[in-house]
């Protein structure tokens, strides 16, 4: 019998959660991560599954995700501990045939349950499936330090925030030309914040929760981690720049346009217009 802990998706989750912990983005039980799988991914590991998988109903049906398996982080679990005990901190779940709930096939031992942000993740998965024709498979939420810091000092406006991040590091426009969506402050772990995040995910692969953290979407764990890492690096630069008295010079609109043309991306118009 093949051991599921050696599968590419469990090993990928171990690396992503460990890297995020080492970055300082996921203190205590902060942050959550979900990866959409295919039946073929989990088929070799049926022998590892729980004999009687627990069933948990969703707070609202999600028929687009019917019969879809995911690997998810657990509620109240520490990213720093995933590498020590994957089965206690991660779970493979599969949405039922009508999208009304899911079974926990593997992991989440001792009656653990998936992240409290699962509604936000699943709703965002639905929108990114539609926005990318199924290419995006990962939703990652973390407490990226400098991005959070900027939400206290920048106007919480998509165009303003995006333009500042583009100017903070040349690669940003290339990596997220679609800009950064921003919500008002909302109570986490609710359907309301999940719906608001998913609405922004229709247009943006990055969504900021002011004074809290960031949501990112991508096709792979590496792409999603790299997306957040790139935005966070720019935020770190900006925090330093603002603390040194602000910008004396920066990347101009004309230079941003040239950058987009060189790399074949279309920058968010509202951010470019500032």
UniProtKB/Swiss-Prot annotation:
Its cofactor is Zn(2+). GO terms for cellular component: cytosol. It is an enzyme of class 4 (lyase). Its main location: cytoplasm. One of its GO terms (molecular function) is rhamnulose-1-phosphate aldolase activity. Binds 1 zinc ion per subunit. This is Rhamnulose-1-phosphate aldolase. It comes from Shigella sonnei (strain Ss046).
